[in-house]
Amino acid sequence: MKWTFIAFLGLVISIFVYFDINEIPIYNLKVAYKFITGVSDYEQYEGLAEKLGYSESDKLLIIHADDIGLSKSVNDASFEALKKGLVNSGSIMMTCDYILDVGEFAIKNPEIDLGLHLTVTSEWRDYKWDGVSNSSSIPSLIDKKGHLFENKKKFTWNANPDDLKRELQAQINLAKSLGINPTHIDSHEGALFFDQKLFKAYLEVGEENKLPVFVPKPVAVHFDKSFPKPKNVVIVDNMYMALPDLEFSKWDEYYINVLNNLGPGLNEIIVHLGYDDKEMQNITVDHPNYGSEWRNLDLDVISSQEFRKAIEDNNIKLVTWREIQNIIY
């Protein structure tokens, strides 16, 4: 019995060490177990494919650009990709310096699918931001230097749901005041996905504002009998994104393989667009992951004929968050 307990304790410690190394701030043992095993208890939004005009066997895909508003470089690349249809959706960081340009773009292009990349972390070394709310009204979200916390772990450890809801609502309100009519919300760095109380706050803000909430399948482990999936939450069956262990030389191969192996259901490819220019190099200094070269590679791939051909050859149906919003609300 003693050795069984010691073995169990060792396993638990190993799991949480793994989470810590990989910046997965899950501190609930039940959620941690479900996250590792992939066990989840939920039903997808009923008849989603049919209501979008397709069948359950169809491969539905959103090609989504994150981090709009971060910089001029990101905006220029993302706006061009959206106008050309290289991506068909994107989301905006309302805490950043270039959101006025996004407001102007949204007003001139009201048909384009733009959501909000709800931001509660400030990860760059030399480019910091605080919340949209007055910092004194969201003290649990702000570090000692007056910025949002630099990583998900510190945010998850310190944030309380009331402060979080206040800030998320402020970001939505600011977007609307700039003429942006958001179609959905998602989470910068996935920071809202790990603690159940904070995740609930995220879902509540979406429902209160009639905005679809991005919930990828691995995050659906939160749902169970004690916390059933809200009826208006649509689960993204498969999410794809280049990760830090991907070699730059394998960029094209990775994305084409995703398209060639895409399965039925709702899928989302997330890209981070920008130019490998001085502005992005300065912002992402000492941070090659999601850095300037990374963003230019993402742009190059989605602009390629090979990428477009793979979409066509695999009979992939492009859908948007606006279409999903129109169905559920």
For each predicted feature, which ranges?
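N-terminal pre-catalytic segment of deacetylase/amide-hydrolase enzymes
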Residues: 3-62
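Acidic (Asp/Glu)-rich catalytic clusters
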Residues: 53, 78-84, 101-113, 130-143, ...
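Active-site beta-loop-alpha junctions enriched in small/polar residues
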Residues: 68, 95, 117-123, 188-190, ...
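Structural preference for beta-strand elements that scaffold enzyme active sites
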Residues: 60-62, 87-91, 111-117, 182-186, ...
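C-terminal domain-boundary segment and adjacent tail
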Residues: 213-216, 287-329
